[in-house]
Every structure is written in structure tokens, then in C-alpha cells.
Amino acid sequence: MERESDRVRALNQRFYDAVSRQNLLGMEQIWSHATHVRCVHPGWTLIEGWEAIRDSWRRIFQGALCLTVEPEDLHVTVLGPTAVVTCRERISSFTLEGSTMQAAQATNIYEKRAGRWELIHHHASAIKPPAALEP
């Protein structure tokens, strides 16, 4: 029997697959469309509501020729109808200006409504490379 944490882990992977495929339709199926959803991209301020979040992803996808976000060091905690996933993201982006690689620490919060898990919060903060932290 599949555990709730396994379901959340699979949905979280679908989220990152949709990001890497720049698939807005996939994002629409994963995100809750409730008014209380929130998102913070690295270097951005808080975005509130599904419409604004969808527009933010659209802008990110339009600016990238190729985007890959790979989660690693994943931790899933299920607390009743709420699940919290923390992970590191390895982000590769290719634009007309060139390519970038960075890392971020992310928290994704899922809510179970009517028997279905939906993403209600995504927060990713850039991680400085260890060499940049040295005095």
C-alpha cells in the first residue's frame, strides 16, 4: 500500500518535471488554485494567488531557452492534511545571454483537499557556493 509520503514525493517530482519541461499546464494540475497559495522564487518577493504565480512561471519560462531544476537531499513530512517537502535544487538555465548554474534551498508545502494533494506554497532561496562564504 502506498504511503502518503510516497504520494507527496511523487507529486513533488512531477512539480520539478513540469518546471524543467516549462510546462504551464502541468503546473496548473499540481498547484492549488485557492487564494491562499504563495510562491517565492530566488531573489523575488512574495507572490500571492494562483493567477500571479502562474504569470511568474510564464515569465521564467519565456526567459529561458532551457531550464532544468533537479531536487536533491529530499525530506518529506506529512502532518495530517498538510505535507512539507524540503530539498536543495540544482538549477541550470540557458538564455540568449548565456548559461547559469546555481543552487537553492526549497520548501514546498502541499495540502490534501477532497483526497487530492495540491501544492500551496513554494519558496526557493539561492545558496551561495561554499567558496563565496570564506573570508
Predicted feature locations:
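A beta-strand edge to alpha-helix "cap/lid" segment located at domain peripheries
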Residues: 1-32, 36-135
